[in-house]
């Protein structure tokens, strides 16, 4: 099965990434990706886009040549309280909010601190998807995080990039996360975490983890555009309402 949705990509606006929106659209057409989110790093990262970048994402068209675009952010979890670096009414203008730990913003400390910070971010109501929770630099109480994600309707990401170019040693943690998500009823999503358009929709390694634990694929948010759009609507993102008619032929 091909998965036509990618929730995690970075553009030239994050200056350690190398592609434009146009590049992603071209690759999406080649690969059969029907919906992707542009989610550049939140402003607290040293080379992140300016705050205005996210405010002005509204200028992006909803669909180009049959490919839908979600306007989003990969925010930074900043502290033990689970606060992120994007706020206020501006959050409600975005279609999708990802958040995770990044060393320049929230240096690794200990398992209890990481767990508390991640669970507080989940409970905040501001974050739709927790990115790369399997990062071995940030050990967490996996069962506690998965339970919170299930309770608060937040998805946990199995990050494909973690097995290829960064966060080496993530396999065991990601397998444990997928198992806990299955057992506790949490939602999973695969993210390419593309920093160059060629890797858009690349889920091979993440999918192997999901298949190994027999996680139900009908709960994967990547399974269809409507599956993700329905999830985001339930999360309170009314901004995606104008995308939904464009996928009226889709089966969630």
From Swiss-Prot:
Task: State the Pfam families in the record.
Answer: PHP (PF02811)
What InterPro entries does the database record attribute to this sequence?
A: Phosphatase_YcdX_put, PHP_dom, PHP_phosphatase, Pol/His_phosphatase_N, Pol/histidinol_Pase-like
Q: What Gene3D superfamilies does this protein map onto? A: Metal-dependent hydrolases (3.20.20.140)
Keywords assigned by UniProt? Hydrolase, Metal-binding, Zinc
Residues that coordinate or bind Zn(2+) 1: 8, 10, 74, 193
Q: Copy out the cofactor comment.
A: Binds 3 Zn(2+) ions per subunit.
Q: Give the GO molecular function terms.
A: phosphatase activity; zinc ion binding
The cofactors it requires, by name, are: Zn(2+)
* Any one cellular-component term (Gene Ontology): cytosol
The protein's name is Probable phosphatase Shewana3_2794
The source's domain of life comes to Bacteria
Q: Which family does it belong to?
A: Belongs to the PHP family.
Signal peptide region = none
Task: Give the matching PANTHER family.
Answer: PHOSPHATASE YCDX-RELATED
**EC identifiers of the protein:** 3.1.3.-
GO terms for biological process, alphabetical: bacterial-type flagellum-dependent swarming motility
Annotated residues that bind Zn(2+) 3 are located at 74, 102, 132
Q: Where does Zn(2+) 2 bind?
A: 16, 41, 195
Q: Which SUPFAM superfamilies match?
A: PHP domain-like (SSF89550)
Q: What is the lineage of its organism?
A: Bacteria, Pseudomonadati, Pseudomonadota, Gammaproteobacteria, Alteromonadales
Instruction: Please give the organism.
Output: Shewanella sp. (strain ANA-3)
